[in-house]
């Protein structure tokens, strides 16, 4: 079993999505019936590779069939794509599609197609080109995180693109919202729980070629409720929503801490927490109420 992991994050090995991909691979190895020695894993970190944009010259179809005129790392990528049994596409969602560096890699797969027009076999789209190589039997898994509270409804263009060049229904997805939380060590109890579910998904995929409905449902569960996450996310920028001015780090920390308040625990009594940063001589108040939490900087409470 040859696994090819394509990390399309501009952050390289610091990618949040890559953490999910590694968990999936760990689970896959545990669930695979093959000896671990027979499983090879090849990683391509696109951010550190030299892959230029396609020129649209179509030399790879006419002048040098199957060979791109651009001499860079893409030829190696194509060789590995042809050789792999399972391909993991790991990437973040920044602006409703894959990052530009990964899109370059996808576009540069043009030499892998024949130039002659063909009909789509899955009824998706209005035309196609047959593959130059035998790609039947290859498995694909898309693993991605995004910065919205939920992945739902934000990957439409990603799905349509992969439907076109992989074929509709020919790949599995793990899309997770609130992706930036995977780098916050203080929230690791929750994110590690999610990574364990991704690991379970990898084991199931190795054994059955799919992810169970039960596990998929858990993967679609929000890391934190929408209101909690969006408060944390807004505070993380360190910029005032009203003035646009930069806020001190201790205030950012206080706002993020306050956002974790669970309003369902309200017992009928409002409470005020006052925090003194003695080294900075800053004082903040957090009001905990039936409707949620609010941070005050003027000592009014």
Outline where the language-model segments fall.
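Feature captures hydrophobic
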Residues: 237-301
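N-terminal beta1-alpha1-beta2 submodule of the flavodoxin-like/Rossmannoid cofactor-binding fold
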Residues: 1-114, 192, 196-245
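Cofactor-binding loop segments of dinucleotide-utilizing enzymes, especially the Rossmann-like FAD-
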Residues: 8, 46, 145-147, 176
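Beta-strand-loop-alpha "switch" segments that mediate conformational coupling across diverse proteins
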Residues: 171-177
């Amino acid at each position: 079993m040859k696994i090819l992991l394509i990390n399309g994050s501009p952050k390289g090995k610091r990618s949040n999505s890559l953490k999910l991909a590694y968990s999936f691979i760990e689970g896959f190895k545990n669930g695979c019936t093959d000896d671990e020695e027979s499983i090879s894993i090849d990683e391509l970190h696109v951010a550190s590779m030299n892959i230029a944009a396609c020129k649209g010259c179509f030399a790879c179809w006419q002048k040098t069939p199957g060979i791109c005129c651009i001499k860079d790392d893409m030829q190696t990528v194509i060789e590995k794509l042809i050789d792999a049994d399972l391909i993991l596409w790991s990437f973040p969602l920044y602006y409703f599609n894959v990052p530009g560096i990964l899109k370059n890699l996808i576009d540069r797969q043009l030499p892998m197609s024949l130039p002659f027009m063909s009909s789509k076999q899955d009824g998706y789209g209005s035309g196609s080109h047959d593959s130059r190589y035998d790609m039947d039997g290859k498995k694909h898994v898309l693993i991605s995180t995004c910065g919205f509270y939920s992945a739902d409804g934000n990957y439409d263009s990603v799905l349509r693109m992969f439907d076109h060049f992989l074929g509709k229904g020919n790949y599995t997805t793990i899309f997770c919202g609130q992706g930036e939380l995977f780098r916050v060590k203080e929230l690791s109890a929750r994110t590690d729980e999610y990574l364990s579910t991704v690991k379970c998904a990898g084991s199931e995929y190795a054994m059955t070629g799919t992810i169970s409905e039960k596990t998929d449902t858990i993967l679609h569960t929000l890391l934190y409720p929408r209101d909690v996450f969006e408060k944390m996310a807004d505070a993380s920028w360190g910029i005032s929503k009203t003035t646009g001015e930069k806020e001190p780090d201790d205030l950012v920390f206080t706002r993020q801490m306050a956002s974790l308040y669970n309003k369902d625990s309200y017992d009928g009594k409002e409470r005020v927490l006052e925090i003194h940063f003695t080294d900075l001589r800053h004082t903040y108040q957090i009001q905990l109420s039936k409707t949620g939490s609010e941070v005050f900087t003027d000592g009014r409470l």
